Amino acid sequence: MKTNPTAYAPETDALDYWESLEGMFTVVKKPHVLGPQYKGDIYVLGEDFTGLPLNNIGGLNLRPHAQNTATIPIYVGNQFVAKAKDYFAEDVTGVVTYRNSFYKVEPTQQLTVQDGGLQRQAAQTQPSEDKLTIASYNIENFSANNDKNETPEDKVTLIANSFIHEIHNPDIITLIEVQDNNGSVDDGTTSGLESGRKLANRIKELGGKSYEYTEVAPVDGADGGKPGSNIRLGILYNPERVSLAKKEAATSNEAAQFDKGHLVKNPARIAPNDPSFDHTRKSLAVEFEFKGQPVVVIANHLKSKIGDDAIYGASQPAVEHTLPTREAQASVIHQFVQEGLKQNPKTTFVLTGDFNDYDFSTTAQILAGSELTNLMSQHDAGDRYSYFYRGSNQVLDNIFISNNMAAKARFEPVHINASFMKEHGRASDHDPVLVQIDFSGAQTSGTPTDDQQGNIGQATEQTSPSSSNTGTQLVPHQAQANEQKSSTSESKEKDKDEDEKQEDKEEAATETKTPGKRKILPSTGQETSYLALFGVAVVTMSLIWYKKKRTTY
């Protein structure tokens, strides 16, 4: 992203740096893969990358106010199978091109990737009698329709098995992207009870617990997502472990309310008629009782990022058009939690879901306020991700909990999807996240101390290094190939990236931009630090090439 669109500065600006390499042969030194192949692209770092600290799987976590522009996209085609930590034993040579609002390297050689050994993991958190376990999982357009283009049976089995063997039968499961019973068949169907029950039945068939399912169906066509599918939030719960507060369920347009600290109707959607929730999913509030204690679980799926400017697109500086809507939604949800805690300070609130925003975002800050703790932001920084997009591990799935129970909570993302492809067992584009809350003692009050928060996870931040730590990894080949510019680059001024995956798939058809304050996207990455060294390195390599040109060619 350019902060000054009128100045050309390849030494300090990511967009200009890539533009300076377009059409040139380049070499990426023995790269390692950062995430799964998606729509023909993989993202890599060269072996000579010495910039930002890597996370626990050798990737780069997205950071505040920056994009990881040091990552290099390589076009490998849709049949190429690769996952995080895989690597290439040889250098990759190719031509820098531009398509779909992004620069990438198109190899001039046959590529063979080596297995880096990364495995899907199971949660360390185990069931316990006095501890309540809540999981959150975006199950990516799930319905009872098993047609080829809907939810095939093998996906149902994969997700069901993950709840049994990898998440260990949590007591409550919040489900994101549950579709209506027939999926994208647009016939006016809104109920998703068959979809939720199909998953519950498959879990039981495979040896898991017996779950019940609850939801509030949306108004037909009003909540965004894939046309005709009516995605919504749903909740599975184990009635042998928790009891659903016995109340009449709210209708689609009835707003959740508290009376003496308890939901008037259960389940109910939060402010379904608020303008900030137009054409997007409404948050679902459900009240349970565990060991005699009230627990209100709020499942969320906030507005997607479709509509934001691409960081290398024609509009510069790039603007995050969708952020004001998520901030407004967060404010509505936070006010709801405040009212519940005001009426009954001993209620445990747990907010889960796909917030379509990061753990460090203003959206997360508004949601937390002074009443809640974001457990993801307290977790080990090297393990702090649930999603992979455009070269960065990042957080879209957070869990917030009442401050009075934060010190009694154990949080864990379960990395079974985001770093992998379907060939490795991936069932969704999101990793599930879970929290286990210890109810064995009396509830405490107030905000947890620093020592108490330390029990949640290591809060070690991945701070930005000085610019002197960064080495180059993408250098021009000795022979320029401007004449080999890809014909696909001709669309650079008008292409909109069709695979912007910070979304609930084809939501663009139904979501509308919300006017409001404009927020600048995080900068494209250390423009004044490691990108400056990229430029210096390129200049240095160019000088070396020039001196050797007569003897080399």
Regions found by a protein language model. Name each.
Residues F102-L233, D308-V319, T325-H334, K346, ...:
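N-terminal, active-site-proximal structural segment of metallo-dependent hydrolase catalytic domains
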Residues G192-K303:
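Structured beta-strand-rich core segments of catalytic domains in phosphoester-bond hydrolases
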Residues V28, K83-L118, N238-T280, V337-F349, ...:
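Metal-dependent phosphoester-hydrolase catalytic domains
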